[in-house]
């Protein structure tokens, strides 16, 4: 059964994080007692069925890659594949685990390649990843030398996927996924780097989200913000109707320049737009590990520069900012 005792033990010994123990255990007890997904028990059984494997080769620098010598047999690989496929859909990755290649909907490694050149070095840093999904980028952060990585995401399938990968990486305790939203966190002012990637446009109040991110950073800490944007000057913002690219919960899509103004309005300094990129059909697509509709189905079939609703097709910007 998934439990958070190792995380509690770690933060109890960390003066930057131990105040979180005032609220978190009660929140997670309430979550387990009253808020579990209907499939959660079956997902946990899949975790219990995973083999105990210690990698002899672990590469978190070029990807999330684990291998062992001797290699798994064909039958063992098939058994591992079947367990991991019971945790579908896999959206963020990819993962290469003992010959089983999880080809996720998103090529999250491509996003990481766009982000990485602009980061302050992560070596030795305490990192928070907000809306971390199944945790792909958390492992890449460790690959860049982060000391400890906390991911938060309330989606329970993502928690189970993260715990599956963790078990297959030798039960690595340097990263933990906590199933809460940022609005449930106290203002810790603790993290050296905070990532929020693919979250802002799902927020009814985007400036409140930026303040919440700021309140998790130490003074001098770095925010890495990635979000949907539109073309235009600092006065341009799209407020979609009921759906955007078939997503219901999209509220504000500013231009990158407006997003920079928002960050400055919230008191961040040294705000810079470091990347803008139109999402390609190669970066987000249907795979054997995510078999429902993906980006291609969300775009106008006659004009891929538009969504099916007629809005500009998804474009994403990365901004870096510093808390004074």
UniProtKB/Swiss-Prot annotation:
EC number assigned by the record: 2.5.1.-
UniProt xrefs under SUPFAM superfamilies: S-adenosyl-L-methionine-dependent methyltransferases
Entry keywords, A to Z: Transferase, tRNA processing
A biological process term (GO) from this entry: tRNA wobble uridine modification
Sites where the protein binds carboxy-S-adenosyl-L-methionine: 92, 106, 111, 131, 153-155, 182-183, 197, 201, 316
Record-linked Pfam families: Methyltransf_9
Reaction(s) catalysed by this chain's protein: carboxy-S-adenosyl-L-methionine + 5-hydroxyuridine(34) in tRNA = 5-carboxymethoxyuridine(34) in tRNA + S-adenosyl-L-homocysteine + H(+)
Molecular function via GO: methyltransferase activity; transferase activity, transferring alkyl or aryl (other than methyl) groups
Domain of life: Bacteria
PANTHER family: METHYLTRANSFERASE, TRNA U34 CARBOXYMETHYLTRANSFERASE
Task performed by this protein: Catalyzes carboxymethyl transfer from carboxy-S-adenosyl-L-methionine (Cx-SAM) to 5-hydroxyuridine (ho5U) to form 5-carboxymethoxyuridine (cmo5U) at position 34 in tRNAs.
Family: Belongs to the class I-like SAM-binding methyltransferase superfamily. CmoB family.
Assembly: Homotetramer.
HAMAP family, A to Z: tRNA_carboxymethyltr_CmoB
Protein name: tRNA U34 carboxymethyltransferase
Organism in which the protein naturally occurs: Proteus mirabilis (strain HI4320)
Gene name of this polypeptide: cmoB
